[in-house]
Amino acid sequence: MVSKSAALVSLGCAKNLVDSESMVSQLIELGYEMTPEVSQAALILVNTCGFLESAVRESIDTVLQLAGYKASGSCEKLVVAGCMVQRYGKKLLGLLPEVDLFLGTSHCHALKSFIRDHEAGSSERLRIAFPDHVDNGADRHLVEGRSSAYVKIAEGCGNRCAFCLIPRLRGPYRSRRAVDILREAHRLVACGAKELNIVAQDTTAFGSDRGEEHALVSLLESLEEIEKLEWVRLLYAYPDRITPELIRTMSQSRKVVPYLDIPLQHCVPRILASMGRSGTDPERIVDAIRSGIPGVALRTSLIVGFPGETEADFQALTAFVECTGFEHLGVFAFSPEPGTRAARMPDRVPPDVAQERRKVLLELQRGISRRRLESLVGRVLPVLVEGFHPETDLLLTGRLAVQAPEADGTVLITDGIGTPGEIMRCRVTAAHDYDVEAELLSAS
């Protein structure tokens, strides 16, 4: 075992992964050598999710499992960071005595100094404050040869959705400087990234905290100029802020892929108003995007079982999903998170009813997804080749431009010689519920 080795376990969303890479950079600066094996690490860093209670349970279970390495003596220091720490703070000190250091989202950028203080004899275990820091990305650890990467363009959230804790966990909306984002993007491409996925709690609010009207459009136009960057993907786009200018920019771009992730949450006006999203008109937004961006793939997320949702409301939502035919769909049963307005609302839908509604929508979406993918069979399309299949070296895997990393399906490459990290032409030969099979033809 390396005398000063460290391992990372990153839970939750892509935005958390960006924070994790920043903390890894700080560990490397302290002299740690990163290892993928937690059993060989002297220091284990866990970046947690605290958005939903189910995610909190997963985070706690993970920490307790990793604490076993402290008991066995292989791990000297267990560090827990992120949203769960920001949400529960001091309560975790007694709940998880095995943990040496806790950092909220407010202090992830200061991991290095916290470890140094601890090694110098400090007995402080928790650092947490109201999140107001904006990371410029300069210290983010970049992995050589990775074909796809995330770029976080803002911190926090300025929306006040009734069901959501993000403003409390992440603070107010704070845009990064465009110059810092572009510098990071250039570094990622220089390290081998062909695809950059733009993330934030709300990407379409970029620049609004500074009074900038078309900051996101300007950023996308600047990313367009980066040589060797092939694909730019926009995730977490708040529906109300998808402007005609953004749609036009995407439709005219050579690099921004025809893909939008728009979390609509529901389609019934009364439910949307109760959620704190009364300005959203889902049908109008979807129609504007589909008419303005040819061949666009849409991903959305929906919440079923929100307080006050009747059977008629759910039937309206089902009809909306069937009519709209989203390429990708995530469905969540309402979770009454303590501290949110929604947790105090009357007319609670029984959890078993909410779960059944979720199953109905997911089954409906399974058929929609398969029909969408079957329409691609026989077409020749570019594929980002990502590497060998996790279960066999006989298959390569990749993604189409209409498939986001981790969230959507994949391309199973059954024939042809491919180069991981390259975008190559393929012919789609078969479709499944969420994945397609394809044969590689040549480089695009």
UniProtKB/Swiss-Prot annotation:
<dbReference type="GO" id="GO:0035599">
    <property type="term" value="F:aspartic acid methylthiotransferase activity"/>
</dbReference>
<dbReference type="GO" id="GO:0051539">
    <property type="term" value="F:4 iron, 4 sulfur cluster binding"/>
</dbReference>
<dbReference type="InterPro" id="IPR023404">
    <property type="entry name" value="rSAM_horseshoe"/>
</dbReference>
<keyword id="KW-0411">Iron-sulfur</keyword>
<dbReference type="GO" id="GO:0005829">
    <property type="term" value="C:cytosol"/>
</dbReference>
<feature type="binding site">
    <location>
        <position position="49"/>
    </location>
    <ligand>
        <name>[4Fe-4S] cluster 1</name>
    </ligand>
</feature>
<dbReference type="Pfam" id="PF00919">
    <property type="entry name" value="UPF0004"/>
</dbReference>
<feature type="binding site">
    <location>
        <position position="164"/>
    </location>
    <ligand>
        <name>[4Fe-4S] cluster 2</name>
    </ligand>
</feature>
<dbReference type="InterPro" id="IPR020612">
    <property type="entry name" value="Methylthiotransferase_CS"/>
</dbReference>
<feature type="binding site">
    <location>
        <position position="157"/>
    </location>
    <ligand>
        <name>[4Fe-4S] cluster 2</name>
    </ligand>
</feature>
<dbReference type="Pfam" id="PF18693">
    <property type="entry name" value="TRAM_2"/>
</dbReference>
<dbReference type="InterPro" id="IPR012340">
    <property type="entry name" value="NA-bd_OB-fold"/>
</dbReference>
<dbReference type="InterPro" id="IPR005840">
    <property type="entry name" value="Ribosomal_uS12_MeSTrfase_RimO"/>
</dbReference>
<protein>
    <recommendedName>
        <fullName>Ribosomal protein uS12 methylthiotransferase RimO</fullName>
        <ecNumber>2.8.4.4</ecNumber>
    </recommendedName>
</protein>
<feature type="binding site">
    <location>
        <position position="83"/>
    </location>
    <ligand>
        <name>[4Fe-4S] cluster 1</name>
    </ligand>
</feature>
<dbReference type="InterPro" id="IPR013848">
    <property type="entry name" value="Methylthiotransferase_N"/>
</dbReference>
<dbReference type="InterPro" id="IPR005839">
    <property type="entry name" value="Methylthiotransferase"/>
</dbReference>
<keyword id="KW-0808">Transferase</keyword>
<dbReference type="Pfam" id="PF04055">
    <property type="entry name" value="Radical_SAM"/>
</dbReference>
<dbReference type="GO" id="GO:0046872">
    <property type="term" value="F:metal ion binding"/>
</dbReference>
<keyword id="KW-0963">Cytoplasm</keyword>
<feature type="domain" description="Radical SAM core">
    <location>
        <begin position="143"/>
        <end position="371"/>
    </location>
</feature>
<keyword id="KW-0408">Iron</keyword>
<comment type="function">
    <text>Catalyzes the methylthiolation of an aspartic acid residue of ribosomal protein uS12.</text>
</comment>
<feature type="binding site">
    <location>
        <position position="13"/>
    </location>
    <ligand>
        <name>[4Fe-4S] cluster 1</name>
    </ligand>
</feature>
<keyword id="KW-0479">Metal-binding</keyword>
<dbReference type="GO" id="GO:0006400">
    <property type="term" value="P:tRNA modification"/>
</dbReference>
<dbReference type="InterPro" id="IPR038135">
    <property type="entry name" value="Methylthiotransferase_N_sf"/>
</dbReference>
<keyword id="KW-0004">4Fe-4S</keyword>
<keyword id="KW-0949">S-adenosyl-L-methionine</keyword>
<dbReference type="InterPro" id="IPR002792">
    <property type="entry name" value="TRAM_dom"/>
</dbReference>
<dbReference type="InterPro" id="IPR007197">
    <property type="entry name" value="rSAM"/>
</dbReference>
<feature type="domain" description="TRAM">
    <location>
        <begin position="374"/>
        <end position="442"/>
    </location>
</feature>
<feature type="binding site">
    <location>
        <position position="161"/>
    </location>
    <ligand>
        <name>[4Fe-4S] cluster 2</name>
    </ligand>
</feature>
<comment type="similarity">
    <text>Belongs to the methylthiotransferase family. RimO subfamily.</text>
</comment>
<dbReference type="GO" id="GO:0103039">
    <property type="term" value="F:protein methylthiotransferase activity"/>
</dbReference>
<dbReference type="InterPro" id="IPR006638">
    <property type="entry name" value="Elp3/MiaA/NifB-like_rSAM"/>
</dbReference>
<feature type="domain" description="MTTase N-terminal">
    <location>
        <begin position="4"/>
        <end position="120"/>
    </location>
</feature>
